[in-house]
Each structure stands twice: as C-alpha cells, then as structure tokens.
Amino acid sequence: MSGPRSTLGLSRRALLRAALAGGAALGATACTPSAPATPLVIAGGVRPGVYISLAGTLADIWRERLGLDGAPQVLTTAGSTENMQLLTGGAATVAISQVDVAADVATGITGPGEPMALARLYDDVTHVVVRRDSDFRTLDDLRGARVSIGPAGSGYQPIALRLLDAAGIGADGLGERAELGLPEADAALRADRIDAFFWSGGVPTGGIRDLADELPIRLLDLGDVLDRVRQRFPVYSVGTVPANTYGLPGPVACLSVRNVLLVTAAMDDGTARALIDAAFLDQPRLAQASPAAVTIDSRSAIGTQPVPLHPGALQFYRSAKDY
C-alpha cells in the first residue's frame, strides 16, 4: 500500500484523533464516533512470536496516530484461545486470533459481545518439527512418540489434535504428550526430551529459524492428511513451506490458517474504523515487526470469513480506494 501525500496524511491523522475523541466525522461516511468506554487492551501472544510483535507495534501506532495519552496495554498470552476468552469476557478490547478459533468461540454469541473482525492479517502455517537425523517422516510415524501438541489456550493445540485424529493416531496414540510453548519445545527437542513438536506461526518463525541454525531439522509433510482435515474443517487451506525457509531438505506441504484482528460489536463504528485506518497508514511498520506481515493489505484484509467484519471496518474498506 503506497503512502499518502503529506497533506493527506495530516488530514487523516487529524480525523483519526478526532474519532477517538468523539468529535469529528471520518471520511465519506460522516459518522460521529465516540471515545472508547475503556482504554485499549490488546490480547497478544507468546514471546517470541508474531502475535506479540504485531500487538506491540499496533499499540505504538495507535498511541501515535490517535493521540492517546499512553500506549494501549499489550497482554502476553498463550495464543488464540486465551485471546478470544479475554476478548469475549471483556478483559481485552482488541485481540489477534486464528480464524478457526475465533469462529468456534463466536458461535452462539450475539449482541455487544459478538466477536467481529477488523482485518485479516496474515496466514499461519502449522509446523511439525523433528530432528533431521530422526526416522520421522509423516504424522503416522509419531505413533508412540514423545510429542508436544502446544499449550492449552493456544490456537495450535486444537489444530494438532485435529491433525492427529485425521492421521488415525489421536492424542492417545502418542507415547508421551507434552503441552509446551515454542521456547520450551525448542529446548526439549534440543535436549532430546521430545521427538517432535507442533507449532503454528508465520513463515519464517524466528524461534524455528534460530533452532534450525543450530540443529538440522525437518518438518513433517502433512500432504497425506490435509484433504481429510479440510473436508471436516473447510476454514483451513493448504500451505507450503519452501526449503530455504529453514534449510530444509525440500519444500513441505502444511496446513494454513488465517489470522484476524478482532474487536466486539460493542465497539462503536468510528473507533473501529479509526483503528484499522491507522494500522494501514503505518503498514510498513507492521511488516518490519514481522516478515509474515508483509502480505497485509487492504485487498486481502477483508477475507475474515466466517467471522463478520465490523461495520466500522467495512466503512474503511469501502472508502479505501479514495486513499
């Protein structure tokens, strides 16, 4: 997305600040937003991780662009499932989540607490990481193995369980099951305390790349189970991790899932529009926060189905061609 001319940038900044102050109309829609009832709190993710990096950058962008007295609070969390619990429970006003988890949580929720999307951010790819010198090649080889499926509260533990079910193993078919976050799983694989671990993140994920720099790894190819998973859960798609991403022997077929930026229906249209408008004004900063965010743009950002876009976000996308 190309940057705005300086005069336009100043005009939009003034409009954005007015949106949170509740005193001006935003763009062609001429809406009159009100200030948030509570300070912005963003449910982020684990450290190190793309979620927490993007959440911190968004907090800085919103503080600067919207003239807030202080940066929004960023919460370190286990990931998507916890983020959605925080959002729907009112402890967070903004959250990042995998779209599958968001859609599951949103089922049956109506009214002010209904989760609504501001934007599709980027796509996560599920990694199943093993040592390259191991005999593990497919999910079926993990039968009886020591495997970390990710921590409770993360978005990738449900994916791990669905993949294992599709492979005919299930969680009970593992030899030992651990629920480790990425740093702990990384350390356990290095120390030979586990044989494999699941992780879902942008490509490349820094923690996996650092591991691959010190320990030759392989990602299990998921091609033999992807059709079965997608038949049951069409929200997923097929992704590929190129060989040069982590120095792999070859490209690997993986499961892909979209990540979305969310608020609830309780947020007024002007504030929602101001948040996403400011984010796109500084999209290059998001890309600097994580290589995964390079793909964020206003054309792909509307792809949040089955989670509906917030009306304020719709206003932004409908008028984005004017920017």
Model region roles, listed by residue range:
Residues 1-10, 18-28:
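N-terminal secretory signal peptides
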Residues 60, 73-112, 128, 183-189, ...:
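Pocket-flanking alpha-helical
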Residues 111-121, 147, 245-253:
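A structural signal for short loop-to-beta-strand junctions that line the ligand-binding cleft
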Residues 39-65, 70, 74, 124-191, ...:
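Bilobed "Venus flytrap"/periplasmic-binding protein-like clamshell domains
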Residues 32-34:
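Bacterial signal peptide processing site
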Residues 125-136, 232-236, 248-270:
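A bilobed periplasmic-binding-protein/Venus flytrap-type ligand-binding module shared by bacterial periplasmic
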Residues 118-125, 212-213, 223, 253-256:
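Short Pro/Gly-enriched coil loops immediately N-terminal to beta-strands
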Residues 180-184, 190-191, 201-214, 219, ...:
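An extracytoplasmic/periplasmic, membrane-proximal ligand-sensing/linker region
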